[in-house]
Amino acid sequence: MEIDLNADLGEGCGSDEALLDLVTSANIACGWHAGGAQAMRDCVRWAVEKGVSIGAHPSFHDPENFGRKEMDLPASEIYAGVLYQLGALSAIAQAEGGRIAHVKPHGALYNQAAREPEIADAVVSAIHDFDPSLAVFGLAKSGFVDAAQQAGLVAVEEVFADRGYRADGSLVPRSQPGALVDDENEMLARTLEMVRGQRVRAVTGEWVPLNAQTVCLHGDGPHALAFAKRIRDALEAAGIDVHAPGALHAGERA
């Protein structure tokens, strides 16, 4: 049994370098919701040094709301924005002796792509046209995963240790009760159940089947680093191999 651990980095949380000792895939903010050129370069350099798979973390252009405000934009504008962000991170990765291996949208773009086919298609098209060898990280069971697979991209299905789930496999919106799981012991138990049992309990009590291929560990919060280590240690103690998905090649030269 195996699993990938990923984290969203370059967002100003201050623990990026240390988190890269614990995760196997890094989703690096591309400047539109957080971060910037220097943060991107730092994260890429550390990821290359530590052999962590490099991923782009594009978003809507929304630094005021950390990329979490949903937007109604033309598909062509979404396509261009994703392409722009991929190009920026790819240039930095190439200069640092690495390459982008995957793409995981951020925030509202991630959530809207999971449920809105037009947005999913725009994001997938940008990724495919930029580099069809790139893998896509998307919410397990979502329409975004389906769209990526239909376009011929490798799709890696993602689950969250600290987010509440609805019965249809979607995440509880952050504005609603049950959206966030705060208890670390509960998060740890949920993670092990998602990886070993391939299921998660919804906020309404049902078991929801999931194809857990990568687990997102959020890097913000005062205890994020210690908790990330707890999760990694628990997975390895359970005999689960922790490494990047086979489709990704960490630290490869462009």
Curated annotation (Swiss-Prot):
Binding partners and assembly: Forms a complex composed of PxpA, PxpB and PxpC.
Keywords: ATP-binding, Hydrolase, Nucleotide-binding
Protein family (similarity comment): Belongs to the LamB/PxpA family.
One Pfam entry name: LamB_YcsF
PANTHER family membership: 5-OXOPROLINASE SUBUNIT A, UNCHARACTERIZED PROTEIN YBGL-RELATED
Entry EC no(s): 3.5.2.9
Name assigned to this protein: 5-oxoprolinase subunit A
InterPro entries tied to this protein: Glyco_hydro/deAcase_b/a-brl, LamB/YcsF/PxpA-like
Gene Ontology molecular function, alphabetical: 5-oxoprolinase (ATP-hydrolyzing) activity; ATP binding
Alphabetical GO biological process terms: carbohydrate metabolic process
EC class: hydrolase
Record-linked CDD domains: LamB_YcsF_YbgL_like
Superkingdom of the source species: Bacteria
Gene: pxpA
Catalytic activity: 5-oxo-L-proline + ATP + 2 H2O = L-glutamate + ADP + phosphate + H(+)
Job description of the protein: Catalyzes the cleavage of 5-oxoproline to form L-glutamate coupled to the hydrolysis of ATP to ADP and inorganic phosphate.
